[in-house]
Amino acid sequence: APYLIMQANHSGRYSNPGNKPAPMIAYRHPILEQYRAADDSCIVTDDYLKGLEEKFGEAALLAKEAGFDAIDIKSCHGYLLAELASAYSRPGEYGGCFENRFRLLKNGIRAAKVYEDDSFMVTARVGIYDGYAYPWGFGVSPESGTTPDLTEPTRLVHELHDELGLDMVNLTMGNPYATTHVTRPFDFGKYEPDEHPFVGLSRMIHGIGAVKKAVPEMTVWASAPSYLRAYADLFTAGAVEQGLCDGMLFGRMAFADPDFANEIVKNGRID
């Protein structure tokens, strides 16, 4: 039977209730605000963020009661928890230092893990690099420009395993609303990237691999193989063989060819 995971997310900057933009942001981001307007009134308060922590526990209980096998606390792709990861300039309990920026993620996971047992797991999707230079993105240092610096992402995955008891995470990169080519390398899309898709594939799998090798006890699922289309299965097999990940999550491929996994099992390859 399929292993069903319910994703728990706060849309943050991309909140769209009633099909009307209503951004809720961690801090003002001049680059992202070129794509979607926001102002100081959109910045969420510490009290609001604190109130969200238990919401992830409530979501876990609902997911468990609905028959899901796991809940995934989402901290990637430009949504609220991921934006807090780069809230270096935000004052208060949810910004500035590493501990504050990941307070909501960690406390949300703790609230969800109350309902964990042999039949229900808590996991997370974690963005390890946004694609922007400091101070506008996570996974970089003040000195690294837009080159990934995985010191903090590696620390986070270590702590998710050692402190919170997470056994499994999915790692990913980028913001599909803005740095789409970082999240999912492509050769046909809404803009022309300034790099070959292979560059994005390499950055993704080797970045994830660096974290996996630093935290080998964590089961790590990698992301974004679909650009390779019919060769994505071979890419995945090689990544697992080289110890860069324990498995791969497919997004676009699953939409385009929902039966692709059965094709691999039955025929040995994606058709």
Regions found by a protein language model. Name each.
Residues 1-271:
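Flavin-dependent oxidoreductase catalytic cores
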